Regions:
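N-terminal ligand-binding lobe of clamshell/alpha-beta domains
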Residues: 1-300
Length: 300
């Protein structure tokens, strides 16, 4: 099989199922595991990822309003790679290449590849995606084992918290810094599984723009900053700077952490289990292991 993955989560699922050698192409954002970094890239982004949060947001909105795609597919490269399976997504047209663009291009390839969209917006949905990918690439047993492993890890966190009768802090998770967005989809469930209460969103709901007043009025006792696509260093640097602004004076004294959103919360794949364990270590540090310094850093 010749697999092209157009999203990091798909790439991570394929790798976790032991089919890394069948990947022949990936998106420009696929960086884990490190072995995929040498594979041909079949997508590009029209927005400078190193620009400021507000500049990125404005450019994405401008492009979307113009009707142009934020992400482009390299048709010639895709044709050269001759994939038999393309993994895509239906979740967000400003997060990855749209399913419609993929199907349009796939229809002119000869032979036509199977196009498989990943649709999960909750942990259960992500588990279903893993099973579906496993079936598509002939790795059903590995997929079932991976889903069971993820469930077992989440269960261990739950049982530890339950046995300790740990209090449930009020948690606000910020997915974008300017404008502010509350994290949605699977993130509220990550918080709940890690022992907290998400005060800004419900599991499965879309990420939504919020103002700082709403965050303040939600009375969080823990602030988590996990900007979509930012690594830990950038997340920590820009989130700490945000907390120093006058609009956030009310948050003085509230514990705050920066999270590697690029690795943990932006990708609906196997590492969501790592995300739960990381958040649990922040939420209940006296009960569960401290989070890895590679994934989280306290900023206040």
């Amino acid at each position: 099989m010749r697999i092209v993955s157009l999203l990091p989560a798909g790439t991570e699922i394929v790798a976790a199922l032991g089919a890394l050698e069948e990947l022949v192409g990936v998106s420009h954002e696929c960086d884990y595991p490190t072995a995929v970094q040498s594979l041909p890239r079949v997508t590009s982004c029209a927005v400078d990822p190193h620009a400021s949060s507000i500049a990125i947001d404005r450019e994405v909105r401008r492009i979307a309003e113009s009707g142009a795609p934020v992400f482009a597919l390299d048709a010639a490269q895709l044709a050269r790679l001759a994939p038999t399976l393309i993994l895509t997504q239906t979740l967000c047209d400003v997060c990855a290449v749209s399913e419609g663009d993929v199907r349009e291009l796939g229809a002119v390839l000869d032979p036509a590849p199977r196009i498989l969209p990943l649709t999960g917006t909750t942990l259960d949905g992500v588990s279903r995606d893993i099973v579906i990918v496993g079936e598509a690439i002939g790795r059903s047993a590995a997929a079932t084992a991976l889903v069971h492993e993820i469930a077992a890890r989440l269960r261990r966190v739950h049982e530890t918290l339950k046995a300790a009768r740990a209090p449930r802090p009020r948690v606000a998770v910020i997915e974008w810094l300017d404008p502010l967005f509350a994290a949605g989809h699977w993130t509220p469930e990550l918080v709940r599984r890690a022992g907290g209460v998400d005060v800004l969103a419900e599991p499965g709901a879309h990420s939504a723009e919020v103002d700082v007043g709403r965050i303040r009025d939600a009375r969080p006792t823990l602030l988590l900053f996990a900007p979509c696509g930012f690594d830990l260093a950038r997340s920590a640097r820009e989130s700490a700077a945000l907390l120093e602004t006058p609009a956030w004076e009310w948050a003085a004294g509230i514990e705050a952490w920066a999270i590697d959103g690029n690795a943990l919360t932006s990708r609906p794949g196997p590492r969501l289990a790592d995300a739960v364990e990381t958040l649990a270590g922040i939420i209940a540090p006296s009960i569960l292991p401290a989070p890895s310094a590679a994934y989280a850093r306290r900023i206040a």
